[in-house]
Amino acid sequence: MNSGSQPQENPGSQSIAIKATGGGAYKYADLFKERLGIIFDKEDEMDCLVAGANFLLEVVHQEAFTYMGDQKQFVQIDQNDLYPYLLVNIGSGVGMIKVEGEGKFERVSGTSIGGGTFWGLGKLLTECKSFDELLDLSYRGNNRAVDMLVGDIYGGMDYSKIGLSSTAIASSFGKAISDNKEREDYKPEDIARSLLRMISNNIGQNLGRTTPQKLAIVVSPRPYEPHIGI
């Protein structure tokens, strides 16, 4: 598409067809055709997503990883025992898809609280002008300055009877209720970090309740790294 020259409007009757998927393939189809002479050959978004995930899991070495706390560990997937698995697609919202084989899948759940929620609320709560700026800001923050932890309720102790550590989040943004502080007393990076944790935890809880699959695959270009997380 980039030949070094500027694209011209209405380039005549000659058209170029390219594969496209997702909402933009429909939303911008007329614009691309009128301005660039490009016709979108549309492919189903979920078909492409599942096919791509299957390919990565079956072919690419160390494409999958898991997190334990803040530590990332790559894992090897047994291609002979891959299915079924749950594919969690995090975009503006979140879709959860049960994949049972090549071309065999169904959407089993989802939530409207996703990447769009993080960006929308983050834009309202901070002065960030882009998603990447908000994400970078969250990496520098400390959610403990904003979130109410189990230790805040139990005097710094674990609630071991039910398996809750003192560092577990009891209430996202909970300290904003109890602290004698004004809005400007809270650092934007701490707010961004708390928001990211809140949304990520919500997705994880929805995932855990959805289906007892042996393997759950989380895919998202952001806020996660561009690999497949288990």
For the regions a language model picked out, list residue spans one by one:
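Short glycine-aspartate micro-motif
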Residues: 15-19, 76-77, 84-89
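Glycine-rich phosphate-binding loop plus the immediately following alpha-helix
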Residues: 56-58, 100-161, 165, 175
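Adenine-nucleotide phosphate-binding core of ATP-dependent small-molecule kinases
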Residues: 161-228
